[in-house]
Each structure stands twice: as C-alpha cells, then as structure tokens.
C-alpha cells in the first residue's frame, strides 16, 4: 500500500516544505539530465531505473525514470515511495488515487492547478509517456523526461495535450521550492517543443 502524498511526511516533520528537501530532489533530477541510454533501452542508468520497477533492460523506461528519481529521494530520506510501482505509464495513471489526480479538463480550465513536481501523463501511439514538471508557463509546462530521444531530456508541452497530472507533493510550498531548485536546468537546457522521440 502506497501513501497519498509527500504532504503527509511534511505534517509529520519527516521532510520539510523548505528548500533542503526540494534541493535534494532537484539534485537527483539534475544529475540525469542529458544522460543517454546505451543501446536500445539499456545501459547502467536505464538498467537501474527499470530495476526499480521490477523490469529488465529493453523495456521503455520513461515511467521507470520518474519512479526511480522519486525512489532515490525516498530512500535517502528513509520514507516509503508514495508512487504506484509500475513501469507502465497508463497503468500508473489507473492506480493514482483520485485525490492525487488532476484530469485534463480541470487543468485546461485552470492551469494554476498544474505545479512543479507533478507527474504528467501523455497518450501516444501504443501506450503513454510521462515525466516530471519543473515549470509552468501559462497553458504550457516544461518537464524532464526519461526515454525522450533515447535520453533524459528537457521538453515543453501544452497542458491540453495531456491525459492529466499526478500530484504526490500536495504542497504548494514544496512545489515552489522545487521550481526554484530546478530553474538552472532550463537555463542550461533549451526545452524541445512537443518533446522528443518516445520509444
């Protein structure tokens, strides 16, 4: 059984809503930006992400990247990972509790609901794609995605093109600190409009 949000840990003072924990999560994310897979959905980095969700090399790894980043943070903090453990984007979305979901219609009508630290869910031919939101820009957002053009990549998408967003922060202050902590990612990596190749 997974937990509902990081806000529970904030309330228990296991993690803080301040910069320290946001910086730690951002640092984990930053170290992977620009790293490429080796071969087809393989290499040590990809192997580690896929292993975190119980899969072997050769599988698509965008969802495993998201889970793996949060899992690395949770293990460092000694807390359970609240994300559903799966390597499938659409299976992940189906397992996200209703209180953690922001459906597309709500996000389009109120883009302020979309916040840094959330996990976007996007449909694609043959499955889905996902990544971690780091900045919101009106009706668009910037994210860091695994398995985008065979690497960990910075992309920009339209909110209207998503299935929805999963919010496991449930904390405006943590989201704001995470945005600040990840701002250097955007300044050194120009986002690709519409994302990269997803396989």
Language model region names:
Residues 109, 124-199:
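Aromatic- and glycine-rich peptidoglycan recognition patches
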Residues 8, 41, 90-93:
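Intrinsically disordered and other compositionally biased segments
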Residues 1-13:
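Short acidic, low-complexity intrinsically disordered linear motifs used
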């Amino acid at each position: 059984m997974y937990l509902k949000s990081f806000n529970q840990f904030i309330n228990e003072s296991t993690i803080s809503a301040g910069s320290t924990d946001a910086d730690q999560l951002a640092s984990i994310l930053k170290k992977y930006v620009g790293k490429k897979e080796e071969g087809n959905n393989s290499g040590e980095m990809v192997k580690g992400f896929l292993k975190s969700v119980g899969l072997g090399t050769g599988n698509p790894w965008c969802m495993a990247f998201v889970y793996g980043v949060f899992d690395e943070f949770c293990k460092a903090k000694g807390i359970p990972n609240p994300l559903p453990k799966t390597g499938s984007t659409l299976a992940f979305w189906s397992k996200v509790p209703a209180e953690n979901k922001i459906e597309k219609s709500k996000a389009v009508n109120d883009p302020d609901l979309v916040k840094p630290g959330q996990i976007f869910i996007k449909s694609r031919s043959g499955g889905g794609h996902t990544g971690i939101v780091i900045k919101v820009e009106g009706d668009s957002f910037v994210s860091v995605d695994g398995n985008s053009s065979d690497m960990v990549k910075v992309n920009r998408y339209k909110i209207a093109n998503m299935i929805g967003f999963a919010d496991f922060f449930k904390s405006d202050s943590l989201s704001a600190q995470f945005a600040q902590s990840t701002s250097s990612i955007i300044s050194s990596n120009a986002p690709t409009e519409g994302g990269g190749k997803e396989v």
